[in-house]
């Protein structure tokens, strides 16, 4: 449908910089996710693309055509909001048909298209109902149907599943992915939910404080975060971070955090010390395992801790451990025997899947 390019886009509200010199390229037919915490500027980006907000500086292009001064109605985009924004006095059929009605589309064609879209979204049986008679999931589908029936060039979706219950949200995610693949419409989806982003997007842009920190496919971002913010934001539970220092023992060099020692390359250590960088070690909860303190075989890549909280999730257990007044998280198999108050030995499974960051800048170093 359309390739969308944002070039050095900035948006200010008074002295507040909501979007700060942001550049993005969204490919034709791509399902692109803007992911970040509340207030990071992702909804403002969506509004700028739609033309609902004016640029402070920069340019926006649709298929190479600058659309900075193009009014919203001329951009041929369809938006779905968190609140769904259905007309309360109209039933579902009338809400879906409304965009065609204002275009003066023939009644017979409107009827045909509404029935087609309703069938696609499995809402044919609720077309006679008013919004107050519909569940959150049904209202979400009606809002989507109203966007689809316009046959826009671009879909802009602003947290459309946030008001849907957890069970239905899982189903709705799958339906949205399938629908986007079928319609082949460039889709830009805003969310603060990293699970939505990881499961739905072809690519993800991580945003914070009006800037993009990293753009890539879900696996790339999970496995190769560029900084501590991305590493801590993407992944559930989030990455564990350990503060420490470099130590030398005979011919060996280690990163040491309390009783945890992780071997590092001498060249890496020398570079860090030369630049006077304070190191942070990052380890994902899935890369840790636990055992009895009595099973300690080596002083390398393990440490002792106390079990603080045990969350049994059915297929696995999330353990919160306490170490030196810090809380860290570990994912272990459901059959693991563990109780609150246990003293345990925590081991790093795979040292090649650990990360080092600059404490001051947050930048990933290795």
Language-model-detected regions and their locations in the chain:
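Conserved ABC transporter NBD signature motif
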Residues: 58-66
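Helix-to-loop junction immediately C-terminal to a conserved catalytic motif
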Residues: 50
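Glycine/charge-rich catalytic "coupling/switch" loops of P-loop NTPases
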Residues: 252-308, 336-366
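ABC ATPase nucleotide-binding domains
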Residues: 72-229, 233
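The feature captures the beta-strand-to-loop junction immediately N-terminal to the Walker
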Residues: 35-37
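Conserved hydrophobic segment flanking the Walker A/P-loop of ABC-type ATPase nucleotide-binding domains
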Residues: 24-26
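Conserved coupling/switch loops of ABC nucleotide-binding domains, chiefly the family-specific signature
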Residues: 56-59, 109, 209, 243
């Amino acid at each position: 449908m359309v390739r969308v390019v944002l070039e050095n886009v900035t948006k200010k509200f008074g002295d507040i910089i909501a979007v700060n010199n942001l550049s993005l390229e969204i490919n034709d037919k791509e399902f692109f996710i803007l992911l970040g915490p509340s207030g990071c500027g992702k909804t403002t980006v969506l509004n700028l693309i739609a033309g609902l907000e004016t640029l402070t500086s920069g340019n926006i292009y649709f298929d190479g055509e600058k659309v900075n001064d193009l009014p919203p109605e001329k951009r041929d985009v369809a938006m779905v909001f968190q609140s769904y924004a259905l007309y309360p006095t109209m039933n579902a059929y009338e809400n879906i048909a409304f965009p065609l009605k204002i275009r003066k589309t023939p009644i017979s064609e409107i009827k045909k298209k509404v029935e087609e879209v309703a069938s696609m979204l499995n809402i044919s049986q609720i077309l006679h109902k008013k919004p107050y008679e519909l569940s959150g999931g049904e209202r979400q589908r009606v809002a989507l149907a109203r966007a689809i029936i316009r046959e826009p060039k671009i879909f802009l979706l602003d947290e459309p599943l946030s008001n849907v219950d957890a069970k239905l949200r899982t189903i709705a995610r799958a339906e949205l992915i399938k629908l986007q693949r079928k319609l082949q419409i460039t889709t830009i989806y805003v969310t603060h939910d990293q699970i939505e982003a990881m499961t739905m997007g072809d690519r993800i842009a991580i945003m914070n404080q009006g800037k993009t920190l990293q753009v890539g496919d879900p696996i790339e971002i999970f496995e190769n975060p560029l900084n501590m913010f991305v590493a801590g934001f993407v992944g559930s539970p989030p990455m564990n971070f350990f503060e420490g220092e470099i130590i030398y023992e005979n011919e060996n060099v280690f990163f040491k955090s309390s009783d945890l020692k992780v071997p590092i390359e001498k060249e890496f250590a020398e570079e860090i010390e030369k630049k006077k960088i304070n190191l942070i070690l990052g380890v994902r909860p899935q890369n840790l395992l636990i055992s009895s303190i009595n099973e300690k075989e080596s002083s390398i890549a393990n440490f002792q801790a106390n079990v603080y909280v045990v969350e049994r999730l059915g297929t696995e257990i999330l353990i919160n451990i306490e170490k030196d007044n810090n809380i860290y998280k570990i994912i272990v198999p459901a059959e693991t025997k563990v109780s609150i108050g246990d003293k345990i030995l925590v081991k790093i499974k795979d040292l090649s899947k650990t990360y080092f960051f600059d404490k001051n800048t947050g930048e990933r170093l290795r």
